[in-house]
Swiss-Prot record:
PROSITE patterns: RIBOSOMAL_S2_1 (PS00962), RIBOSOMAL_S2_2 (PS00963). GO terms for molecular function: structural constituent of ribosome. GO terms for biological process: ribosomal small subunit assembly; translation. The keyword Phosphoprotein does not apply. It comes from the Archaea. Residues 7-23 have a biased composition (Basic and acidic residues). Keywords: Ribonucleoprotein, Ribosomal protein. Residues 1-23 are annotated as: Disordered. This is Small ribosomal subunit protein uS2. It holds the Pfam family Ribosomal_S2. GO terms for cellular component: cytosolic small ribosomal subunit. InterPro entries: Ribosomal_uS2, Ribosomal_uS2_arc, Ribosomal_uS2_CS, Ribosomal_uS2_euk/arc, Ribosomal_uS2_flav_dom_sf. Belongs to the universal ribosomal protein uS2 family.
Length: 231
């Protein structure tokens, strides 16, 4: 599916100085840390760009606030949560993982993630009762749910919470995290950001499962995870 005429949060306004980039390559104690993705790659995709509002739940993931009020996420914490989420999700049978996306820019990343990992993808509107009504033809029983945006994937979240399914979510600075069990702070609105996030998470899950070596890469490039635009 291709998308056009949609407002995308581009990777503008979140530029960092070289000193700040260098700081993000180090732990709080000053030691160089090895990220899943180089700092410059994270930044060029805009994974760190938040919104102009921040809920109390997301404050601990903020790196700084720009003069115009834009909240900027800490890529070290994004990276850390990607690792934690990958380790957690790798414990499940792939077919028991459902990944959902109501926001169009997340459709292709979610579908490619499911293809690579072996999980199941649900994009677009979630039919009420999908997780709760066994009489529906669309009824499924996942063991864990991965959502692209708590603000738009509300139907899936409510149903998963009702039946006790653990929920992992990509959450921007404006997110309300009711029912979310594991947060991955990130720009979940940008096309390039979503592609990189789902690609990095898929790769790390395969590493955790030992499908690929600890330093192995996916056969599928990040570009294949990116939602295509109509010219």
């Amino acid at each position: 599916m291709k998308v056009t005429n949609l407002s995308e949060k581009e990777e503008r306004g979140g530029e960092l100085t070289e000193a700040e980039k260098e700081e993000l390559r180090k732990s709080e104690k000053g030691a160089i840390i090895e990220l899943l993705v180089p700092v410059d790659t994270y930044l060029s995709a805009g994974v760190h760009i938040g919104t102009h509002s921040c809920t109390k739940y997301m404050e601990s993931f903020v790196y700084r606030v720009r003069a115009e009020g834009l909240y900027v996420l800490d890529v070290r914490k994004i990276d850390e949560r990607l690792r934690i989420a990958a380790k957690f999700l790798s414990r499940y049978d792939p077919q028991d993982i459902i990944v959902v996306a109501s926001r169009p820019y997340a459709y292709r990343p979610v579908q490619k993630f499911a293809e690579v990992v072996g999980s199941r993808a649900l994009v677009g509107r979630i039919i009420p009762g999908t997780f709760t009504n066994p009489y529906l033809s669309t009824y499924i029983e996942p063991k864990v749910l991965l959502v692209s945006d708590p603000r738009t994937d509300t139907q899936a979240i409510k149903e998963a919470a009702k039946v006790g399914i653990p929920i992992v979510a990509f959450a921007d600075t404006d997110a309300k995290i009711d029912y979310i069990d594991l947060i991955i702070p990130a720009n979940n609105k940008g096309r390039k950001s979503l592609a990189l996030l789902y690609w990095a998470l898929a790769r790390q899950i395969l590493r955790e499962r030992r499908v690929i070596p600890p330093d192995g890469d996916l056969a599928v490039p990040v570009s294949e995870f990116e939602m295509r635009l109509v010219q």
